[in-house]
Every structure is written in C-alpha cells, then in structure tokens.
Amino acid sequence: LVEQLVRHNQSEDLQYAVYCSRKSYNNERWVYHGAKTEYVGLNANGIQSIPYDIVSLIKAARQSDVVLILGVSGCAFLPIFRLFSQKRLIINIDGLEHRRDKWNKWARKFLKFSEKQAVRYGNVIVTDNKGITDYVLSEYGKPSELIAYGGDHVLQDISADESDAALQKYGLTANKYSLAICRIEPENNVHTILEAFSQTPDQQIVFIGNWNKSAYGNDMQEKYSKFDNIKILPAIYDLRILNVLRSNCKYYLHGHSAGGTNPSLVEAMFFAKPIIAFDCIYNRESTENKACYFNSSKILIDILNDSSLDFENNAKSMEAIANRRYRWDIIAKQYESLY
C-alpha cells in the first residue's frame, strides 16, 4: 500500500515521509519516488513491532502535519500520543487481527484494546471492506471511510516465449490447472481446498505457499503431495512468474476467511479468470457476489464438477470489478482526499 501511494502521488503539495525498519534493508535510501524515508532500528514485525510503531509515531508527530497509520498494533500508545500531539491521525485498521486464530488469548486481547484506541483517537478510520465498515459502526458507533487496495500493479507485458518457458518449468499446460496462492495457515482453508482436489483426480491444482513455516504446512504437504493432480510449490516471489501462472490458470482458488479485502484476491481479479472463493462476507463484498463460493470440501467438489456454472461470466465480472474498484490511481486519490 505505501509503495503504491508513494508511486501515485502527483501532487506538489503532498510530501510523504515513510518510516522503515533498518533491520530490513541492506542499503538505505533517503528518498524513494519523491518520498522521504527514515529508518528505525527495530523490526517492523513480531514483538518489536509495537515499540517500532511507537518510535515511528513520535518521529511523525514532530515532522508531519498528518500521520497515516497502517494497522493497529501500535495504537495502544495513542492515549499517550494525544497528550503531546493533536496531529491529524488517519488509521487503516486493516483486518480484524484480534479475531485471527494464530494469536493466543492475550495477544488477541491486546490487539482488541489497540483497535479500540485506534477508533477512539483516530480522526479518520479507514476500512478496506464493507464487512469491516459495518463492524466498526456496530461495535464502536463510528463511521469509517471505505478504501480497498489496488491490484493493477501485477499487469505486465509478458511474451509468449517467456510464458511458455515458465509453464514448461513447472510442467503445466495453459488452462488445465487451478491455482491457489497464500500463506499456509488454517484460516486460509488450505486443508479444505486440498481435500477437495484429492477427491477430484481429473482436476489439477497448483498450490503455492510457505509450507515449511509451520507444523500445519508440513502436515498438509506430507498428506497431499502424494496425489498426482496436486502440485505443491514453495513460495514464489518473482512477480513475472506468478503472473504467468495466474494468467494461464483455469480457476483461481481463494481460501482466505479472515477479515478484510485481501490483496491477493484483488490482484487475481485483474487476470479475468473465474474466482472460486471461500464463502465469507469479506470475499463476497470484494467480488460483489459474482464469484463462486464454497465453505466445505464437498461444496468445492460440487463446483468443480458442475458444468452448468457460468464461469465465463464469472471471469468477465471479476475483471470488470477490478478495473472499476481496485486500480491504484483510484485508491491513491481516495487516500489523498483524507489528508
């Protein structure tokens, strides 16, 4: 998000300052696409993310007119922040982190407290999905600005030769495989998708993710890699290869169930492929109820075997929605209107 806001800034009156973790960069740049960059000597993720956010907030209070906060982990500090700064705070609360299964009870309590402080002390609250917009209104009685994510940065000119080479590398034939890409976590319904394909041997799936990062991932890989129609691949970070795989798949499977508009879903929609998504309010809002939806392996099997479904219209609708709602020039202007 920050990358694209900076890249799409066309205003001479708007100057971004971005706070970065020194731990994540070997070479520090002090200007990036016109934005000033400042470095904090703490990790931006994990337990250090909280002091990292606090240090960044203190620096921003001294140097900026408006402070844009992405995520709520550091917002527990806002009651203290307001004692010495009345700077305008725009806070994107992201997904509902306190509801995610991967956090223990105490982490969830802390994240819920931080979310509450964000909504209380923020001048403007940004939500990325109508499901979260409705949640903030019902939970806190406060309206929020609905701004999603862009996905058109994935569109690239890729030659037929480059595309053929990538497909050949992975032993794939265009439009003969389904594709899923995600972090390998239970809330992304990896098991639900793989179980369905294990029972439909005539349907091939390529599943890309960080399989070796958890016991869950290792278990999934061990259980399902033995099926001839299931190709399990490690995480791929080359955007061009990912785009070849996305643009040549038969169906795109999206199993995310946790809060908000998911960037990987938005990106996939630009490739005009049929989307089969887990049935939750966030995915239905993102796709305007025009994709196919499953909430069990059985229903997914039924979808895969149902030749009467209008997958062509599904694909056209996904592309049309993406171009109407999820272009970065639109998203950047929406944010700039809040400053």
Q: Model-flagged regions — what are they?
A:
Residues R7-G46, G131-E139, N212, Y216:
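N-terminal strand-loop element at the rim of the active site
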Residues L309-Y339:
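A charged, aromatic-enriched C-terminal amphipathic alpha-helix characteristic of glycosyltransferases
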Residues I58-R62, A107-I125:
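Membrane-proximal helix-turn-helix segments that form the acceptor-binding/catalytic region
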Residues Y251, F270-A277, R284:
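Short hydrophobic beta-strand element within catalytic cores of glycosyltransferases
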Residues N218-L239:
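Nucleotide-activated donor-binding/catalytic signature segment of Leloir-type glycosyltransferases, i.e.
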